[in-house]
């Protein structure tokens, strides 16, 4: 069984030729590729494809009902919130995802952000550009205090693949790892209710998915529980942290710093409280934690395996 496929938004995975599609081309008789697909073009671009590959294109129930031939939807990501799973299920269309493809890339970015904050790299680079070192009366600059990570407490909210990988890196730096309990009934050793974990940690790293129950999970109350010398890192999803409350805390000096790779709207077409350049001790990156070339290539390889499994009547990484 050989299937016809379409990739609706290749530009979100790699548009400069650094990601190869050979693995997909081997398992599909035809692969049509679109760099981007606006909402009004989804049904037209899908056409007679039997396999639809997408990353961020939204597949609504209305669109799915109009697909004439689709048998499998392959999401080039772990989260599948942009696909109406109920509509796919009702029409007998399978849906697969790619879990854990960017685990190491994510862990790498978390610590790139943490180290940048901790070492005050932005601030010291600014001093260098201003010629401060040339004018210094001694061999070094001590304008911004640097703390060692060793001996500090690293809190993890969301202990899946990425949370575990981040924890291993934290331990390599000599940090103690504390994990937030999943719920009030989670009594496993080493797990702490969120309200008990927050006051203890020097770093809080967030790795939970964005769900109705996790939206604004870290709001004004939770931010106030953190120590003033604590640092918050969010490479999970925008919307988990109350962005306006975080901006307020940073301006007031109630937190030592924060770094986020995600915002509640991406791209932030309508602005965002965290994009104010006057906010101190804040780093914002444009959702790049997952984007190592290796991770993006791994997505392609894994989707090809998902399609091959489907052709063989097997279930692999199926969410519907």
Locate predicted features.
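Phosphate-binding beta-alpha-beta segment of Rossmann-like dinucleotide-binding domains, i.e.
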Residues: 91, 99-153
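Hydrophobic/small residue at the entry helix of a nucleotide-binding pocket
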Residues: 162
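Rossmann-like adenosine-cofactor binding region
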Residues: 59-65, 176-178, 182-273
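Short beta->alpha connector loops at strand-helix junctions that form conserved
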Residues: 76-77, 93-104, 181, 236
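Rossmann-like dinucleotide-binding domain for NAD(H)/NADP(H)
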Residues: 95, 229-320
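Conserved N-terminal Rossmann-fold NAD(P)-binding element of oxidoreductases
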Residues: 156-157
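N-terminal glycine-/charge-rich "phosphate-binding" loop or analogous flexible N-terminal tail
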Residues: 1-49, 311
């Amino acid at each position: 069984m050989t299937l016809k496929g379409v990739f609706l938004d290749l530009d979100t995975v790699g548009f400069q030729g650094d990601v190869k599609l050979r693995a997909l081309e081997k398992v599909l008789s035809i692969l049509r590729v679109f760099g981007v697909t606006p909402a009004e073009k989804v049904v037209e671009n899908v056409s007679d494809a039997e396999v639809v590959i997408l990353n961020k294109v939204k597949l609504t129930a209305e669109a799915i009902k109009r697909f004439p031939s689709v048998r499998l939807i392959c999401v080039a990501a772990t989260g599948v919130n942009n696909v109406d799973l109920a509509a796919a299920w009702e029409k007998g269309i399978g849906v697969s995802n790619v879990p854990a493809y960017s685990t190491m890339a994510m862990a790498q970015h978390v610590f790139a952000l943490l180290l940048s904050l901790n070492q005050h790299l932005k601030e010291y680079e600014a001093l260098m550009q201003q010629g401060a070192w040339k004018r210094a009366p001694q061999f070094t600059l001590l304008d911004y205090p640097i703390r060692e990570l060793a001996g500090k407490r690293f809190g993890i909210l969301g202990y899946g693949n990425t949370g575990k990988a981040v924890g291993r890196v934290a331990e390599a730096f000599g940090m103690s790892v504390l994990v937030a309990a999943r719920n009030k009934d989670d009594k496993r050793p080493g797990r702490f209710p969120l309200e008990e974990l927050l006051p203890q940690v020097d770093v809080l790293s967030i790795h939970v998915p964005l769900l109705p129950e996790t939206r604004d999970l870290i709001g004004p109350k939770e931010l106030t529980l953190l120590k003033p010398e604590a640092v918050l890192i969010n490479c999970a999803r925008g919307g988990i942290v109350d962005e306006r409350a975080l901006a307020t805390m940073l301006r007031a000096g109630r937190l030592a710093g924060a770094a986020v790779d995600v915002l509640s709207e991406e791209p932030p077409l309508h602005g965002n409280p965290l994009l104010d350049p006057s906010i101190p001790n804040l780093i914002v990156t444009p959702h790049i934690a997952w984007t190592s070339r290796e991770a993006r290539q791994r997505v392609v390889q894994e989707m090809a395996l998902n399609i091959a499994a489907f052709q063989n009547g097997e279930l692999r990484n199926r969410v519907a």
